[in-house]
Amino acid sequence: MESRLLQGGTEGMSGVPKISVAVPVYNEESIVEELLRRVLAVLDSLPGGPHEIVLADDGSSDRTWSMIEQAAARDPRVVGVSLSRNFGHQAAIGAALDHVTGDYIVVMDGDLQDPPEVISELLAEAQKGFDVVYVIRIKRKESMMLRVCYAVYYRLIASLADLDLPVGAGDFAILSRRVCDLIRQSPERQRYLRGLRTWYGFRQKGLEIERDARHSGNSKYSLRRLVRLALDGVFAFSVLPIRLATALGAFVVACSALFAFYSLIVKVFFGHSPEGFTALILAITFLSGVQLLFLGVIGEYIGRIYEEVKQRPHYVVKQVVRKTNSGA
């Protein structure tokens, strides 16, 4: 199996490659038509084909899925994958990747903040021998609050994760077939795509672009979801939180030993014990809070282990729509 997976990379690829674009969408009825128009226009400009766009609908409650169905019925290049409920952004990306057929796979969000016109540049770089070409976002056009949150998020991941994750790089990237297959076969229940593609290695390169403003509607990434994504990145690729708990525990033990030694000296040589009832209460309260915090950290790791051992699927597909070239 491993030898098969390592085939189909960038080295030695002959002929004109087929391109697949994998896009997760959720309640994007105001964007779907423009998204398809721009992506298909880019695919039309590329040699070879037939290329395709695979849209994974993550349990939308608006007209997103019906619009995808209509587009897929008209155009064999459009493939729709409907999930049975909302499984989350990363799961929807996984669903799209599981249905692509291309030699190179572009992963991008459906809000058009990642300009589809960059796909041709990504492909050109990938054909120079790179298995992954990821986009580094510069000059983001979101609100100041979101820009600050994203800046904190990227630096948190870079400092805590046991990977050299590039700052500013999101999910927008082009993958070789072998990297795509490796990600697809990853058994992790809670995948963190940008971490996985870095972990697998191979030749990678970053491409800086200026990110567009959202085409319409509101961002589906709330502060809570952004925090959740950051935690996924940290807990999936680092044991540093556990090590911090160990280090802090050792520090507290050392401080306690020093204070006990100090109390003994004061008692022996001065005949009384150090006073400080308020300080004692504050110390107990502080240490209790620290203990609860790190119990939460340990609980997070245990909870993720629990999710892994249940072996539930990453997502459940309700329907797939794909028109064949014969019109069937």
Functional labels for PLM-detected ranges:
Residues 85, 110-112, 177, 209, ...:
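Short, conserved catalytic or interaction motifs in soluble domains
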Residues 2-18, 192-328:
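Hydrophobic helical membrane-anchoring modules
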Residues 39, 96, 111, 133, ...:
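Residue-level signature of catalytic and energy-coupling elements of molecular machines
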Residues 24, 83-85, 173, 246, ...:
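Short conserved micro-motifs on helix faces and helix-strand junctions that flank
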Residues 73, 98, 124, 128, ...:
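Solvent-exposed polar/charged
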Residues 2-142:
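Structured catalytic core of nucleotide-sugar glycosyltransferases
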Residues 26-30, 113, 117, 184, ...:
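Residues in soluble alpha-helical coiled-coils and helical-bundle/repeat scaffolds
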Residues 79-85, 89-99, 104, 116-196, ...:
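Acceptor/aglycone-binding surface of glycosyltransferases and processive sugar-polymer synthases
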